[in-house]
Amino acid sequence: MSDLTDDSIAVAGAGFGGLAAAAYLAAAGADVTVYERRTEVGGVAGRLTGEGFRFDTGPSWYLMPELFDRFFADFGREPSDYYDLERLDPNYRVFWEDGDRADVPNCEIG
């Protein structure tokens, strides 16, 4: 990436994309400010909780782990420096109002 030490750059949104862009821009020397309208960062990687339940507000699966590996490697780090992954089985469970439920199993494709 070019030398951006003379540049001030605003990034709109503190989701995965915005935070990744800000990290790369800052690594190139830019003075970066990230703006986020919500009180939490993470974009769709949030959750809502209430009445004993937890809901993802976005992705429920860790897709394309190689992209996360490459991002952290670009900064001399590994994902495990920041978080642990645990395979869940079932992947998730869906509950209906009448008490029925369905489990979505953990299985690899291919």
Identify what each model region corresponds to:
Residues 4-34:
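N-terminal Rossmann-like FAD-binding beta1-loop-alpha1 element of flavoenzymes
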Residues 12-15, 37, 58, 64:
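A secondary-structure boundary/capping signal
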Residues 72:
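Beta-rich carbohydrate-recognition and catalytic domains
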Residues 53-67, 78-110:
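Dinucleotide-binding Rossmann-like beta1-alpha1 core, especially the glycine-rich loop
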Residues 26-51:
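Glycine-rich FAD pyrophosphate-binding loop
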